[in-house]
Amino acid sequence: MSKILIFFIILFSALQSYEIKQTPIKFSQKRVELTKQYIRQHYGLKVEDIKITPQIILIHYTAIEGFKKSLARFESETLPNDRPDINKAGSLNVSTHFMVERDGTIHQLMPLNYMGRHVIGLNFNSIGIENVGGEGFVENLTVEQLLANIFLVNYLKKRFETIEYVVGHHEYRCFEDTELWLEKDDGYRTKKFDPGPSFMRDLHANIKGFKKAPCD
């Protein structure tokens, strides 16, 4: 992305204000209990609730082009049968705190202080932002989504002073040798491409006060 375009993105994002639409996924006591089980199985922690203290903002793409189809992947409380890459790790369905449409519309899907299942090893200390797109593992997120993500990470920093990092899903394994990494199963890893280095480079060029992934 050119320096001129980055300048205009910074200028526009400083003036832009976003409505965060409340679009809750199903999160009954059943999902809470499944989350507790996941925490116990994968992190070795026995918890009374599923509240988190976020230190990382984790950026994703859905690998699906449509918002409704993307949202549908998170609705069920239990994991669908078509996820053989992760279903061996528990029946808790994936979840994320935010989803950003192609036009930059922001949806909050779940409470910000609840743990979602959106990344191996780092769920217990991260807030997930899913961006609609990336089908076929193509880096095709929009400028509108970039602007919305700039707004969101700054908004979240104001909400949670504990947040230090903004990283892409493809960078999650950079944390394996840090105190933030909690996964106990050394065989539970998947290869991720989202949202891609270009989007993260452009995002970091337009935000301040956040650390990059430790191996960056």
Where do the PLM segments sit?
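Short coil-to-beta-strand
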Residues: 57, 120-129
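Basic/polar, cationic surfaces and motifs that engage anionic cell-wall
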Residues: 18-33, 135-216
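Short, solvent-exposed loop/turn and secondary-structure capping segments
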Residues: 68-74, 109-111, 121, 178
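Solvent-exposed, acidic/flexible segments
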Residues: 50-52, 91-92, 119-122, 138-146
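Short, conserved "active-site rim" segments that organize catalytic pockets and cofactor/ligand binding
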Residues: 40-106
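Macrodomain-like recognition of ADP-ribose-binding/processing modules
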Residues: 18-40, 49, 93-98, 103, ...
